[in-house]
Design a protein with these regions (language model features):
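Gram-negative/organellar outer-membrane beta-barrel architecture
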Residues: 1-133
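C-terminal outer-membrane beta-barrel translocator/porin domains of Gram-negative envelope proteins
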Residues: 1, 98-104, 108-190
C-alpha cells in the first residue's frame, strides 16, 4: 500500500523464498513525517538461512529497524538508523571447528549511517550524472563487533543519441573490531 489512510504512508509486507533462505518483512515508510521533509521508517523482519548442506550451519535472525532519512544539503541525503536482532546459529557435524564455536544465541544492536550524494539529471531513465552512496553499520551491542562498510558509485553518460552507458563500482567489507572471526551471518557472500 503506497497511500495508507490517504497520508502518503507506504506499508509493505513481503515474503521471499529461495533455495537456502526464507525472509519475511513488514515495513512502514512515511516520506514526510509531520510535514518535516524527513522520512521515517520502521520494519520488522525474520530471516532463516539454511546452509547445512553446503557449509554445515543454519541461522535464524529476527529483529527490527527504525530510521530516518533527510536532505542535509542540496543533492546530499543523510540517513540514520538503529537495528536490533536476536539470532540463533546452529551447526551440524559437517561444520568446521571455527563454525561450531559460533553456535549459540546472539543479540546485536547496530547504528547505521547512510550518505547519498545524487547528481543524476533525473531519477528515472537517467542519462547523465552520477550517484555516490556510502553506508556503515557500527556495532553498539555485539559479541563479535562486526563493522560493515559499503560503497556504491554509478556514473551515467549518453555516448550516442538515445544510447545511455553506465559504469558502476560496488565495494563492501566486514571487519571484526575485536580481531575475532566474523559471525557467519555477517560475512559477505558473493
Amino acid at each position: 500500500e503506497n497511500n495508507y489512510l490517504g497520508k502518503g504512508i507506504s506499508v509493505n509486507s513481503n515474503v521471499t523464498l529461495n533455495e537456502e533462505s526464507v525472509k519475511g518483512i513488514i515495513s512502514v515508510y512515511n516520506p514526510n513525517y509531520k510535514n518535516s521533509d524527513k522520512s521515517v521508517y520502521t520494519n520488522v523482519q525474520s530471516i532463516e538461512t539454511n546452509r547445512l548442506a553446503a557449509f554445515g550451519y543454519k541461522t535464524n535472525k529476527t529483529g527490527f529497524e527504525v530510521g530516518t532519512d533527510f536532505e542535509y544539503l542540496r543533492n546530499l541525503n543523510i540517513g540514520l538508523s538503529t537495528n536490533t536482532f536476536y539470532e540463533k546459529i546452529e551447526t551440524d557435524s559437517s561444520a568446521s571447528s571455527l563454525q561450531k564455536k559460533q553456535e549459540g544465541d546472539y543479540l546485536d544492536t547496530f547504528i547505521g549511517l547512510n550518505i547519498d550524494y545524487d547528481k543524476r539529471n533525473q531519477k528515472f531513465q537517467t542519462s547523465d550524472g552520477f550517484r555516490s552512496m556510502y553506508s556503515v553499520d557500527l556495532p553498539i551491542i555485539s559479541e563479535t563487533n562486526t563493522l560493515t562498510n559499503t560503497y556504491n558509485y554509478k556514473y551515467f553518460t549518453e555516448l550516442y543519441e538515445n544510447n545511455v552507458s553506465s559504469f558502476s563500482i560496488f565495494l563492501s567489507s566486514a571487519v571484526s573490531l575485536k580481531d575475532e572471526d566474523i559471525k557467519l551471518s555477517e560475512r559477505i557472500i558473493l
